[in-house]
Protein backbone atom coordinates (compact mmCIF):
# COMPACT_ATOMS: atom_id res chain seq x y z
CA UNK A 1 0.00 0.00 0.00
CA UNK A 2 1.09 3.54 -0.76
CA UNK A 3 -0.80 6.38 0.91
CA UNK A 4 -0.20 10.11 0.58
CA UNK A 5 -1.38 13.21 2.42
CA UNK A 6 -0.36 16.64 3.60
CA UNK A 7 -0.07 18.12 7.10
CA UNK A 8 0.34 21.74 8.15
CA UNK A 9 3.38 22.93 10.09
CA UNK A 10 4.14 26.31 11.73
CA UNK A 11 6.96 28.11 9.90
CA UNK A 12 8.47 31.56 9.56
CA UNK A 13 10.64 33.04 6.79
CA UNK A 14 14.29 32.06 6.60
CA UNK A 15 16.61 34.69 8.15
CA UNK A 16 17.59 37.51 5.83
CA UNK A 17 21.26 38.42 5.30
CA UNK A 18 20.19 41.98 6.02
CA UNK A 19 19.15 43.17 9.44
CA UNK A 20 15.48 43.87 9.85
CA UNK A 21 12.33 42.84 11.61
CA UNK A 22 11.73 39.17 12.13
CA UNK A 23 9.24 37.69 9.65
CA UNK A 24 5.80 36.75 10.90
CA UNK A 25 4.79 33.12 11.27
CA UNK A 26 2.63 31.19 8.82
CA UNK A 27 1.60 27.62 8.05
CA UNK A 28 2.98 25.49 5.23
CA UNK A 29 2.07 22.03 4.04
CA UNK A 30 4.32 19.10 4.83
CA UNK A 31 3.78 16.67 1.97
CA UNK A 32 4.29 13.03 2.81
CA UNK A 33 3.79 9.42 1.87
CA UNK A 34 3.92 6.09 3.66
CA UNK A 35 4.69 2.73 2.09
CA UNK A 36 3.60 -0.45 3.88
CA UNK A 37 2.53 -4.05 3.43
CA UNK A 38 -0.73 -5.61 4.62
CA UNK A 39 -0.58 -8.87 6.56
CA UNK A 40 -4.22 -9.70 7.26
CA UNK A 41 -5.25 -6.93 9.69
CA UNK A 42 -1.67 -5.88 10.46
CA UNK A 43 0.40 -3.11 8.85
CA UNK A 44 4.09 -3.83 8.17
CA UNK A 45 5.76 -0.43 7.89
CA UNK A 46 8.36 -0.04 5.14
CA UNK A 47 9.10 3.67 4.96
CA UNK A 48 7.79 7.20 5.41
CA UNK A 49 8.85 10.43 3.70
CA UNK A 50 7.79 13.90 4.87
CA UNK A 51 9.10 17.29 3.70
CA UNK A 52 8.01 20.88 3.25
CA UNK A 53 8.25 21.27 -0.50
CA UNK A 54 6.48 21.03 -3.81
CA UNK A 55 4.50 18.20 -5.33
CA UNK A 56 7.42 17.67 -7.69
CA UNK A 57 9.75 17.16 -4.71
CA UNK A 58 7.52 14.36 -3.48
CA UNK A 59 7.28 12.91 -7.00
CA UNK A 60 11.09 12.90 -7.25
CA UNK A 61 11.31 10.94 -3.98
CA UNK A 62 8.78 8.40 -5.27
CA UNK A 63 10.61 8.15 -8.58
CA UNK A 64 13.87 7.40 -6.75
CA UNK A 65 12.11 4.62 -4.82
CA UNK A 66 10.66 3.23 -8.03
CA UNK A 67 14.01 3.31 -9.84
CA UNK A 68 15.64 1.54 -6.89
CA UNK A 69 12.96 -1.15 -7.33
CA UNK A 70 11.86 -0.80 -3.72
CA UNK A 71 8.32 -1.20 -5.07
CA UNK A 72 8.53 -4.35 -7.26
CA UNK A 73 5.33 -3.76 -9.24
CA UNK A 74 5.71 -7.10 -11.01
CA UNK A 75 5.58 -8.97 -7.67
CA UNK A 76 3.22 -6.93 -5.49
CA UNK A 77 -0.28 -5.59 -6.02
CA UNK A 78 0.31 -1.90 -5.45
CA UNK A 79 -2.65 0.12 -4.26
CA UNK A 80 -2.63 3.88 -3.66
CA UNK A 81 -4.96 5.60 -1.16
CA UNK A 82 -5.31 9.38 -0.92
CA UNK A 83 -7.83 12.18 -0.67
CA UNK A 84 -8.99 14.15 -3.70
CA UNK A 85 -5.97 16.45 -4.05
CA UNK A 86 -5.10 16.86 -7.74
CA UNK A 87 -1.36 17.15 -7.01
CA UNK A 88 -1.41 13.61 -5.64
CA UNK A 89 -3.30 11.81 -8.39
CA UNK A 90 -1.56 13.61 -11.25
CA UNK A 91 1.81 12.30 -10.02
CA UNK A 92 0.53 8.82 -9.16
CA UNK A 93 -0.89 8.29 -12.64
CA UNK A 94 2.46 9.28 -14.13
CA UNK A 95 4.59 7.14 -11.81
CA UNK A 96 2.38 4.11 -11.14
CA UNK A 97 -0.14 3.88 -14.00
CA UNK A 98 -1.03 0.24 -13.27
CA UNK A 99 -1.61 0.65 -9.52
CA UNK A 100 -5.10 0.40 -8.07
CA UNK A 101 -6.36 3.78 -6.91
CA UNK A 102 -8.64 4.46 -3.95
CA UNK A 103 -10.25 7.73 -2.91
CA UNK A 104 -10.07 7.76 0.87
CA UNK A 105 -13.43 6.40 2.02
CA UNK A 106 -13.74 8.74 4.99
CA UNK A 107 -12.85 11.76 2.87
CA UNK A 108 -15.57 10.76 0.40
CA UNK A 109 -17.99 10.27 3.29
CA UNK A 110 -17.29 13.80 4.55
CA UNK A 111 -18.38 15.24 1.20
CA UNK A 112 -21.62 13.26 1.30
CA UNK A 113 -22.32 14.31 4.90
CA UNK A 114 -21.75 17.97 4.01
CA UNK A 115 -24.21 17.76 1.12
CA UNK A 116 -26.79 15.88 3.20
CA UNK A 117 -26.61 18.48 5.98
CA UNK A 118 -27.26 21.31 3.53
CA UNK A 119 -30.05 19.48 1.72
CA UNK A 120 -31.89 17.69 4.55
CA UNK A 121 -30.72 19.48 7.69
CA UNK A 122 -27.68 18.83 9.89
CA UNK A 123 -28.11 15.87 12.22
CA UNK A 124 -31.50 14.85 10.82
CA UNK A 125 -32.53 11.24 10.29
CA UNK A 126 -33.18 11.94 6.61
CA UNK A 127 -29.62 13.20 6.12
CA UNK A 128 -28.10 10.14 7.82
CA UNK A 129 -30.30 7.74 5.86
CA UNK A 130 -29.30 9.35 2.57
CA UNK A 131 -25.58 9.16 3.40
CA UNK A 132 -25.85 5.52 4.51
CA UNK A 133 -27.73 4.58 1.33
CA UNK A 134 -25.22 6.42 -0.87
CA UNK A 135 -22.21 4.75 0.75
CA UNK A 136 -23.89 1.35 0.44
CA UNK A 137 -24.44 1.95 -3.27
CA UNK A 138 -20.76 2.81 -3.66
CA UNK A 139 -19.86 -0.49 -2.00
CA UNK A 140 -22.20 -2.27 -4.45
CA UNK A 141 -20.51 -0.65 -7.50
CA UNK A 142 -23.51 1.61 -8.11
CA UNK A 143 -21.55 4.86 -8.26
CA UNK A 144 -23.36 5.99 -11.42
CA UNK A 145 -26.67 5.76 -9.51
CA UNK A 146 -25.26 7.87 -6.68
CA UNK A 147 -24.02 10.57 -9.06
CA UNK A 148 -27.28 10.57 -11.03
CA UNK A 149 -29.31 10.80 -7.82
CA UNK A 150 -27.31 13.81 -6.66
CA UNK A 151 -27.83 15.57 -10.00
CA UNK A 152 -31.61 15.01 -9.73
CA UNK A 153 -31.82 16.64 -6.30
CA UNK A 154 -34.00 19.74 -6.01
CA UNK A 155 -31.83 22.07 -3.92
CA UNK A 156 -33.30 23.16 -0.62
CA UNK A 157 -31.11 26.29 -0.51
CA UNK A 158 -28.42 28.17 -2.40
CA UNK A 159 -25.80 26.35 -0.32
CA UNK A 160 -27.34 23.00 -1.22
CA UNK A 161 -27.42 23.94 -4.92
CA UNK A 162 -23.72 24.73 -4.84
CA UNK A 163 -22.84 21.52 -2.98
CA UNK A 164 -24.95 19.41 -5.36
CA UNK A 165 -22.86 20.63 -8.30
CA UNK A 166 -19.57 20.27 -6.42
CA UNK A 167 -20.28 16.79 -5.04
CA UNK A 168 -21.54 15.40 -8.35
CA UNK A 169 -18.45 16.74 -10.14
CA UNK A 170 -16.18 15.44 -7.38
CA UNK A 171 -17.57 11.89 -7.52
CA UNK A 172 -17.50 11.86 -11.31
CA UNK A 173 -13.86 12.98 -11.32
CA UNK A 174 -12.88 10.17 -8.95
CA UNK A 175 -15.35 7.56 -10.21
CA UNK A 176 -12.66 4.97 -10.94
CA UNK A 177 -11.49 5.23 -7.31
CA UNK A 178 -14.85 4.48 -5.68
CA UNK A 179 -15.21 0.68 -5.94
CA UNK A 180 -14.94 0.22 -2.19
CA UNK A 181 -16.63 -3.17 -1.96
CA UNK A 182 -14.39 -4.75 -4.61
CA UNK A 183 -11.29 -3.25 -3.04
CA UNK A 184 -12.16 -4.45 0.46
CA UNK A 185 -12.85 -7.97 -0.80
CA UNK A 186 -9.43 -7.84 -2.45
CA UNK A 187 -7.83 -7.12 0.93
CA UNK A 188 -6.96 -3.50 0.23
CA UNK A 189 -7.34 -0.63 2.68
CA UNK A 190 -9.85 2.02 1.66
CA UNK A 191 -8.89 4.64 4.26
CA UNK A 192 -5.76 6.74 4.69
CA UNK A 193 -5.34 6.17 8.42
CA UNK A 194 -1.77 4.92 7.93
CA UNK A 195 -0.47 8.22 6.55
CA UNK A 196 -2.52 10.24 9.05
CA UNK A 197 -0.86 8.26 11.84
CA UNK A 198 2.55 8.95 10.28
CA UNK A 199 1.70 12.66 10.03
CA UNK A 200 0.99 12.71 13.75
CA UNK A 201 4.04 10.72 14.89
CA UNK A 202 6.59 12.22 12.50
CA UNK A 203 5.34 15.75 11.93
CA UNK A 204 2.83 16.97 14.50
CA UNK A 205 4.41 15.54 17.68
CA UNK A 206 7.72 17.33 17.00
CA UNK A 207 6.87 20.42 14.96
CA UNK A 208 3.56 21.47 16.54
CA UNK A 209 4.77 22.45 20.00
CA UNK A 210 3.68 25.51 22.01
CA UNK A 211 5.42 28.60 20.68
CA UNK A 212 7.39 26.66 18.06
CA UNK A 213 7.96 28.33 14.69
CA UNK A 214 10.38 26.70 12.29
CA UNK A 215 12.54 27.87 9.44
CA UNK A 216 11.53 25.51 6.59
CA UNK A 217 15.10 24.25 6.19
CA UNK A 218 15.35 23.37 9.90
CA UNK A 219 11.91 21.75 9.84
CA UNK A 220 12.94 19.61 6.87
CA UNK A 221 16.14 18.52 8.60
CA UNK A 222 14.12 17.51 11.67
CA UNK A 223 11.63 15.65 9.47
CA UNK A 224 14.50 13.74 7.84
CA UNK A 225 15.67 12.60 11.27
CA UNK A 226 12.14 11.68 12.35
CA UNK A 227 11.64 9.64 9.18
CA UNK A 228 15.00 7.93 9.70
CA UNK A 229 13.97 6.98 13.23
CA UNK A 230 10.68 5.40 12.16
CA UNK A 231 12.17 3.86 9.02
CA UNK A 232 14.85 2.10 11.09
CA UNK A 233 17.71 3.92 9.34
CA UNK A 234 18.64 6.45 12.03
CA UNK A 235 21.93 4.70 12.85
CA UNK A 236 22.98 4.66 9.20
CA UNK A 237 22.07 8.32 8.76
CA UNK A 238 24.12 9.37 11.78
CA UNK A 239 27.05 7.20 10.70
CA UNK A 240 27.01 8.88 7.29
CA UNK A 241 26.90 12.28 8.96
CA UNK A 242 29.92 11.42 11.14
CA UNK A 243 31.88 10.24 8.09
CA UNK A 244 31.14 13.48 6.26
CA UNK A 245 32.14 15.45 9.34
CA UNK A 246 35.45 13.54 9.52
CA UNK A 247 36.15 14.29 5.86
CA UNK A 248 35.55 17.99 6.46
CA UNK A 249 38.02 17.86 9.38
CA UNK A 250 40.70 16.14 7.30
CA UNK A 251 40.02 18.23 4.20
CA UNK A 252 38.71 21.58 5.46
CA UNK A 253 36.83 23.72 2.92
CA UNK A 254 38.69 26.40 1.04
CA UNK A 255 38.19 30.05 1.88
CA UNK A 256 35.74 30.30 -1.02
CA UNK A 257 33.73 27.31 0.24
CA UNK A 258 33.78 28.18 3.95
CA UNK A 259 30.48 30.02 3.77
CA UNK A 260 28.60 26.98 2.45
CA UNK A 261 26.14 25.40 4.89
CA UNK A 262 26.95 21.98 6.27
CA UNK A 263 24.97 18.91 5.27
CA UNK A 264 21.68 18.78 7.23
CA UNK A 265 21.93 15.15 8.30
What are these regions (language model features)?
Residues 1-265:
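Catalytic center-proximal scaffold of phosphoryl-transfer enzymes
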Amino acid sequence: MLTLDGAMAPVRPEPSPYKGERGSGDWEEVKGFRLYLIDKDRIIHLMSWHQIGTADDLASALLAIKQAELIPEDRVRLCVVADGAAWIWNRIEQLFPTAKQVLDYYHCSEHLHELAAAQYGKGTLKAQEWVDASLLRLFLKQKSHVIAGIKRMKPASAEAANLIKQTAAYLKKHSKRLDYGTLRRGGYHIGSGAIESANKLICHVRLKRPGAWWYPSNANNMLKLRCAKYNGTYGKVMQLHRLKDQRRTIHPPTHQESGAPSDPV
